[in-house]
Amino acid sequence: MELSFQKKTKNYKKNIISLVFHTSLKCKKRCHVIEKLLSSGCKPLDELLGGGFERGIVTQVFGAAGTGKTNICIQLAVECVKQGQKVIFIDTEGLSPVRFKQIAGENAKEIARSIIIYEPLSFEEQYSSVREVERIAGENVGLVVLDSATSYYRYELEDDETGIKSRRELANQIGFLHALARKHGFAALITNQVYSDVVGGGVRPLGGSSLEHISKTIIRLEKTGEGTRRAVLYKHRSRPEGSSAEFTITAEGIR
């Protein structure tokens, strides 16, 4: 079975896009949408978040390779389509069609039609992909995924001695995505890679304090065993930070 994602392959160019501020009436309508949560279909994870992923904000999920970041992205995308909305998926990691079919199940082909995929090949193209979201965000889009936000950012750091320029560009991308999420009421999910903190010990998410500030919810993923993972609330506006939930990665998704 072949999947027919709506892949975007336009020439990537930076566009100057001005944000449109809402009147108070439009803001009230938008706030009504933002209050709703998007279920992931994974009960432990939804309960940890108070019912699901919050719309109108950026949620960041970080962790080492193989902790389940992309699995969460795919499953949340599938659940969003099942609820009648479209998904924009900015893929810098190489989305596996096989894994998508496993999680989406027998309706994978139909679900794929409601997922618009961008496949940037550089940090600059990633920027253009994020900017493109504004053009179609009003077309019943319920979720925007950026998996991963920092894979190309890592390469940029190699040519940026201080890292200031790269961090600023990354913050601009995610800040713009957050503004669009607020404006249109969709859920925004980004994944992040980690680095070893030689001073404080352990691992920390890439991107610095700016990315942490923009992300209103942050989840840290940890391996706890063969196929089992722990999700820890690193940051949340209304749930206790440090609380955690265990989930399992199965052939059909996360449970």
Model-derived regions, located:
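Short, small/acidic-rich helices and loops at N termini and domain boundaries
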Residues: M1-S24, K28
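Catalytic P-loop NTPase motifs of RecA-like helicase/translocase cores
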Residues: S96, Y152-Y153, D197
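Pre-Walker A adenine-sensing motif
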Residues: C42-G52
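Conserved P-loop
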Residues: E54-E132
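Short beta-strand segments at enzyme active-site cores
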Residues: I90, L143-S148, H184-Q193
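Phosphate-binding/switch region of NTP-binding enzymes
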Residues: R168, G175, A179-R255
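N-terminal pre-Walker A segment at the start of P-loop NTPase domains
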Residues: R30-P44
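Phosphate-binding/switch loop-helix module in NTP-utilizing enzymes
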Residues: P120-K183
